[in-house]
Amino acid sequence: MKGRGTHAMSSKKNNLPKNVSVEMVDPDAGIWEATATIDNGDFGSRTLRFETGLLARQADGAVTAYLDEDTILLSTTTASRSPREGIDFFPLTVDVEERMYSAGRIPGSFFRREGRPGTDAILAARLIDRPLRPTFVKGLRNEVQVVITVMSIDPNEMYDVLAINGASASTQLSGLPVSSSVGGVRMALVVDEEHPEGQWVAFPTREQVSQSVFELVVAGRVTEPAKGGRGKKSQPNVAVMMVEAGATDNVVERIAEGAPAPTEAVVAEGIEAAKPFIATLCAAQDALRDAVDTESREFELFPPFDEDVYSAVEAECDADVAQIMTIADKQERDESLAENMQETVDALIEQFPERESEIRAAHNDLTRTIVRQRILEDGFRIDGRDHTSIRDLGIVVQLLPRAHGSALFERGETQILGVTTLDTLKMEQTIDSLGPETSKRYIHHYNFPPYSTGETGRVGSPKRREIGHGALAERALTPVLPSREEFPYTIRQVSEALGSNGSTSMGSVCASTLSLYNAGVPLKAPVAGIAMGLVSGLVDGKEKFVSLTDILGAEDAFGDMDFKVAGTSEYVTALQLDTKLDGLPSEVLASALGQARSARLEILQLMEDAIDAPDQMSELAPRITKISIPQNKIGEVIGPKGKTINQITEETGANISIEDDGTVFVSAVGGEAAEAAIEKINAIANPQQPKVGDRFLGTVVKTTAFGAFISLLPGRDGLLHISNIGGDRRIEKVEDELNVGDKIQVEIADIDNRGKISLVPVDED
């Protein structure tokens, strides 16, 4: 922390990279701090600090992480003292707590306190979990909880990648059995006048991201150092574990101005550019761990099975499983595999009493081995395809008659229904988070009901996985959406996963493009997505990598990589990668990207055959007309306490939204209602001065003892005196002839020097 003396670490300091330091900042309290400096060349440098010993001392591991000075978060890692019984998985939980005080704000909820995590917090938690989970030793069954608390944030910064590093650092100090530290970095390809070809900037600010064409988050760990040449210091090898990437909102406009398009080659360059920064961050975390001298704790491990069980299972059912894994139909294959597993359990349970879970785990591992071996040695996939083929595609557009847009996209047994709903800008989603956004115009929701996999389960509020898949599809489509000015609608896109056997998120991208076109949304370009996989292993003593196009669910589970790529025919709009390997060779990644592009182009062609341009908007969708009024007339159009605008809405049935710059959006399902509302708005904002002799069909808005006030135009009333109401007859009460809301034909008889209008009735005959 600031204001304290420092005490340099005496050991291992000379072995640190020059941009990493570690020191004791308070010897009495035992507070240590490691610092990593990120050099961005022309774009300056960033400083990340990891401090331990001051906050949350009772947690197993606690680190306060700083990005420069103003962005601070606390990461804690805590483990239960005993294993959780009755489970066969590692119970890791990652929670992100966004404290509104970190931005100097009070929560907008009724109780004025933080509630359940918002979308940003959930996505950040997933971003941390994905690279952190694989570092834990297999067989751990103790509950582990990582909690990230955002304590201070610069409004121009993003905290999620700092949280990846903080979570890894606190886990390193917890004494838990992990293989290595994890470093995470956000990279943005910033294009400006000084860098027309773009420069990759690490830990960019929000302002720098707005100047970029592509951003990506890369997480990885350091493996064995690479061998340096004679006289050269060896450089660490960085194994990429996770990538989350997407094009920026303005990528189409920036490319038109001459900026480089984020092609597959450019994306691969960005991933490579991230590796030195990851190595620096891992070095800082390791230095802090070594300085604190954390003791490793002993944990009981529960391997899924012992070798004797696996050998028995292999001897019992190897040939049967090999035959079953040639069945192309998912349901038939799953049923046959389940039956074979039960038969194997029945056959071996006497030999291995009370070890049924081991038999089942060994059966699963045998299945995995058979599938991988066939792919590597024979080029044979479960459903008979080669490694570059796409499953059969099916497309149906305008499936739902009352929806504004809909489309069904099928890829093999994966079936996605995309549904588009359009509404006025008043329906934008209000956002109460730490980010600068206060509203969102494009909303993408993804639903994954249990019946999509033939199972039962909970339905209702979305799970973290559904929120993550929806965010990925949203990221893929946002760069090609029309601007507010071009298309002044709020767009809600829903992806219904009706059947799942591999990459429903990429199926959602395809279904959404088709549905948006069907709704009449003028996309800048169609977008399609494909899921890739990877299987690696030794064949004839040599390491072999096989990239798989359009993976099945089983290939996802048994493979080494889940790699999703979405984009147009020209560039990538979204990418997500998770790998289980210690390292992904650059040439393998480049090959997989190229293979994904070929598949994407094939899918885009089939989508174009189904619908190649936006359809006419549905008659059920609101028609929105945009007009402009002088800013000094906004108050008159709204009226006191909204009286005038509410009156126009009530009389015409149109919805009206007024922006601060005088832009007015008028929407109605029927065109006549919108035209009537526009006419009334123009009458106020650009009025024609009423003159004696003008006639109007007015509305009674108020009655008094001396007459009735008649609304002629919005904001302009006239008085029909009681003496003129009855014609030749004398009336005692205005209400005997007229009441509020009545329509009456009147003529302007006089306008005095104060602008007061006197009216006389007009004989309708």
From Swiss-Prot:
Q: Which residues cross the membrane?
A: none
All copies of the KH domain together span 622-681
Q: Where in the cell is it found?
A: Cytoplasm
What InterPro entries does the record point to?
ExoRNase_PH_dom1, ExoRNase_PH_dom2_sf, GPSI/PNP, KH_dom, KH_dom_type_1, KH_dom_type_1_sf, NA-bd_OB-fold, PNPase
Q: What is its main location?
A: cytoplasm
What is catalysed by this protein? RNA(n+1) + phosphate = RNA(n) + a ribonucleoside 5'-diphosphate
Keyword Nucleus: yes or no?
no
Kindly indicate whether the keyword Transmembrane helix belongs to this entry: no
Keywords, A to Z, come to: Cytoplasm, Magnesium, Metal-binding, Nucleotidyltransferase, RNA-binding, Transferase
Spell out the coiled coil positions from the record: none
Which cofactors are required for activity? Mg(2+)
Superkingdom in the source lineage: Bacteria
A GO biological-process term: mRNA catabolic process
Query: What Enzyme Commission number(s) does the record list for this chain?
Result: 2.7.7.8
GO CC, one annotated term? cytosol
Which family is it part of? Belongs to the polyribonucleotide nucleotidyltransferase family.
Q: Please state what the protein is called.
A: Polyribonucleotide nucleotidyltransferase
| Gene coding for it | pnp
